[in-house]
């Protein structure tokens, strides 16, 4: 049953409330690229990727529409590994990461969704999982909030049933971060899992100083203290600090993750299927981590990642933060007693409200066999 139709759409979606972190500054909107693959039976696989502040979204859509659609037209959608390698090598001269990996991700997620439709299995079962439940944490994008506002947000997360929370760090002065983390620890209690995310704000020396200052608050992990490509810096963090390190959301290939785990240091590898190239490389990163005795976590698109974490044996926490996309989902992620529950419908079960998104569409493409 070959692919007979391919539809691609690009959107620029305003956020209801602007967000802020130490790297991107204020974020007022996000970009979304959606791919729909249709086979001869009329079954549809949906995939998507996203950007911050809509930067690069048009280029990602163009890569898919101009360079990947011709490769996919008439192809066997069940040959996911083969198609992934063909996409990689088709784009490698201008890609090997970056926007090429974003483009591949939207296609690869659609292929896996279509496989689930064809086999009448939810993605988490297709991957070999035996439980749909995954521990989840609330990912706050809250660097601009006052300490009072930060704690009020945390109380809202507790009311929603979360049993773990992540906050942002990376303020202008380390003393501000210490004060804010201290307030959160006092609010949440000594045993509540609390993560902190610096969004690559620091140099290695600054990160070591921050880890030392924050160690007494027993963070579950310190996320992205430095840029992820700095292998020597991560090796130093592993040797010279005692706070667990999570990183990887800004790595765009399996090779980069393997190098980080081999030559650098990470306690919680953090691949993002929407930016890494899709589900196929995400699973490979999880296997590499498992071979090293490391748990894997996630970043963004929690409606996809809940399946992936439920499908691997070395899952840690699922980050829950939809970046505004949840407004356009017909069914939102289900939470129960601090755990996210992957849908039991075939594929990934993400049903986008395309009518609701239509006012924000900036480009569209369609190809028929």
PLM features per residue range, with description:
Residues 212, 218, 229-339:
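Shared catalytic-loop signature of beta/alpha-barrel
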Residues 108-141:
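Glycine-rich, aromatic-flanked loop segments that form ligand/cofactor-binding clefts
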Residues 1-70, 359-361, 365-369:
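N-terminal basic, low-complexity leaders that serve as flexible interaction/assembly modules and, when applicable
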Residues 47, 136-139, 165-167, 194-198, ...:
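Hydrophobic faces of well-ordered beta-strands that scaffold small-molecule active sites
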Residues 128-241:
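Metal-dependent enolase-superfamily TIM-barrel catalytic cores that perform enediolate-based chemistry
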Residues 4-15, 27, 32, 299-369:
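Flexible C-terminal active-site loop/helix
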Residues 3, 42, 68, 107, ...:
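Conserved, mostly hydrophobic/aromatic
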Residues 5, 38-118:
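Metal- or metallocofactor-binding catalytic centers and their adjacent structured scaffolds
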């Amino acid at each position: 049953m070959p692919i007979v139709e391919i539809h691609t759409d690009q959107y620029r979606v305003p956020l209801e409330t602007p967000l802020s972190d130490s790297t991107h500054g204020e974020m007022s909107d996000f970009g979304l690229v959606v791919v729909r693959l249709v086979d001869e039976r009329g079954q549809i696989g949906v995939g998507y990727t996203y950007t911050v502040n809509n930067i690069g979204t048009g280029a990602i859509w163009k890569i898919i529409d101009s360079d990947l659609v011709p490769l996919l037209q008439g192809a066997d959608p069940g040959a996911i590994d083969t198609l992934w390698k063909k996409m990689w090598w088709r784009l490698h001269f201008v890609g090997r990461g970056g926007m090429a990996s974003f483009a591949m991700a939207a296609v690869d997620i659609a292929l896996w969704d279509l496989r689930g439709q064809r086999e009448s299995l939810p993605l988490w079962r297709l991957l070999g999982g035996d439980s749909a439940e995954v521990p989840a944490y609330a990912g706050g994008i809250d660097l601009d909030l006052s300490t009072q506002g930060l704690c009020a947000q945390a109380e809202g997360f507790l009311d929603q049933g979360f049993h773990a929370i992540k906050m942002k760090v990376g303020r202008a002065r380390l003393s501000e971060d210490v004060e804010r983390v201290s307030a959160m620890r006092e609010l949440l209690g000594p045993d509540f899992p609390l993560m902190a995310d610096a969004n690559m704000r620091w140099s290695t020396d600054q990160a070591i100083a921050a880890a030392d200052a924050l160690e007494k608050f027993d963070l579950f992990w310190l996320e992205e203290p430095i840029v992820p490509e700095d292998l020597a810096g991560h090796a130093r963090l592993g040797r010279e600090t005692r706070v667990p390190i999570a990183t990887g959301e800004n790595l765009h290939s399996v090779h980069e993750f393997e190098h980080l785990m081999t030559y650098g240091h990470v306690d919680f590898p953090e691949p993002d299927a929407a930016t890494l190239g899709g589900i196929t490389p995400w699973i490979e990163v999880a296997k590499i981590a498992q071979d090293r005795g490391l748990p894997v976590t996630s970043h963004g698109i929690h409606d996809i990642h809940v399946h992936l974490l439920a499908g691997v044996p070395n899952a840690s926490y699922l980050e829950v933060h939809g970046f505004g996309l949840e407004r356009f989902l017909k069914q939102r992620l289900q939470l129960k007693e601090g755990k996210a529950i992957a849908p039991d419908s075939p594929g990934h079960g993400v049903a986008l409200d395309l009518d609701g998104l239509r006012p924000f569409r900036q480009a569209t493409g369609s190809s028929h066999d």
